[in-house]
Curated annotation (Swiss-Prot):
Its EC number is 4.2.1.33. GO terms for biological process: L-leucine biosynthetic process. This is 3-isopropylmalate dehydratase large subunit. It comes from Acetivibrio thermocellus (strain ATCC 27405 / DSM 1237 / JCM 9322 / NBRC 103400 / NCIMB 10682 / NRRL B-4536 / VPI 7372). Its cofactor is [4Fe-4S] cluster.
Amino acid sequence: MGMTMTQKILADHAGLDKVSPGQLIKAKLDMVLGNDITTPVAVKEFRKIGVNKVFDVNKIAIVPDHFTPNKDIKSAEQVKFIREFAREMGIVNFFEVGQMGVEHALLPEKGLVVPGDVVIGADSHTCTYGALGAFSTGIGSTDMAAGMATGEAWFKVPEAMKFVLKGKPGKWVSGKDIILHIIGMIGVDGALYRSMEFTGDGVAHLSMDDRFAMANMAIEAGAKNGIFEVDEKTIEYVKEHSTRQYKVYKADEDAEYVATYEIDLSQVKPTVAFPHLPSNTRTIDNVGNIKIDQVVIGSCTNGRIEDLRVAAEVLKGRKVHKDVRCIIIPATQKIWKQAMNEGLFDIFIDAGAAVSTPTCGPCLGGHMGILAKGERAVATTNRNFVGRMGHPESEIYLASPAVAAASAVLGRIGSPDEL
């Protein structure tokens, strides 16, 4: 049997001609990533290894983004600790306040990940870079420490699931709706330790921002990684953001998949994930009358420029409902500046929304929009577990920027078509 995209990348980085699902391998790493929560633990473990330098100062990225700008003394101490480590080791890609952004939006923008890479990150949504045709996956801080020291990591080669995307999505349907539709279909463990491989002629109708959102949420189906075939849009994106050489891996015709799904994108509707699982989905025409207290538009899933443009399209000339707080968080400084230059901030502020500096912030219940007991939020983030954004008795509804913006105006979960 042949190999999938993921299996080919892993085989090449392990120096092997072929790998099979379940095989344990040791592969070379192109990037090791950590943030302000996971890196302090990794640094402590790194010290225990007994080495005095990292394997490559250019192949490590440290992004303080979760509690940044520092929300309290403890978070300030954490960032100080990893800042000093980055300086000591000469790590090139340490992104301070003013340069930093939400890590999984920042690394592709900076050209640090290209097709065919193997990337590990001490953050579960590291799978985002599969949008570029890379193998990327989340790991723990101990593996980050070992990766920084050796430039290698061990993997169990995953089985694969194939998602053949067909047709063209309709108005207001984005990558977020498509991945919520898929997770609703297969469940939060439907792709457990498998690679989700996205292909088909429908991929051409998805922007890179759509693909980043979909790969980002592969972990919400339990996947080891999500990965898209490289096409002209990918190549154009990489050309614009990176000067690195790269290799494109295509699946063999006889590659083996444990399951294959065909998704007609024209039939996918705007979709909302109800509490408390990303798989608890309903289409927008079946949500009922759910009043809300807060809307958050941002995160590593939906804080990119296209997301903000869609939100602005919905909010333009309208007002956020008097009972709703609307918080908009561009994912990086570059996106923030672009949104400002395009006049999107005027639209947001005139509508009554607040615009934040780039940060993960409320997504993980960190800061910049914590929920109180009994409050409901519509968020363009990726997780709606109990207590994820604040009080354990609050509720989170996951949606696209279009639905989130419309809900901010309506005061309840709803569609832009209702405005």
